[in-house]
Amino acid sequence: MLDTTTSTALKQRLLIIEDEGEMCLLINLLLDDEDLEIEHVKSLSAAVEYFQQQAPSLVLMDNRLPDGYGIDFISFIKHKYPGTKVVMMSGMDAAAKDVALENGADLFLEKPFSRSQLCRAIHLVTGWHREA
């Protein structure tokens, strides 16, 4: 049965596309105080399946994934789900950052990043602010 409680209904959905389990766990821990419904997939093919079921409000995506590059997946998201915000995260060079932004990423977050940098990035692209 679908949970229709007010707190669940108001939560924004974040999809993390990241193949490294430790990084995903770290992101979950960093965002523990945020009022987000967080889902995680490890590949682009799993992300496509996820999008067929529901569109998240925000995607936090690594670039190097087992079945392709996140940079190439941005255009799929932006074309089919224009309301979904995309934050690319990677330890790549400045040229890759430029390509990610040119492909439609709303923001590029360079690894490693702090909790405040991650939360600021989410708030900047979505306008979400945690209720006190």
For each feature predicted by the language model, list its residue ranges.
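Alpha4 helix (beta4-alpha4-beta5 surface) of REC/receiver domains from two-component response regulators
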Residues: 72, 92-109
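Two-component/phosphorelay signaling modules centered on CheY-like receiver
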Residues: 21-39
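Active-site residues of response regulator receiver
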Residues: 62
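Acidic catalytic/metal-coordinating carboxylates
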Residues: 43, 69-72
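Short amphipathic alpha-helix used as the core "switch/output" element in two-component signaling
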Residues: 49, 71-81
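Acidic, metal-coordinating helix/loop segments flanking the phosphotransfer/catalytic sites
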Residues: 40-58
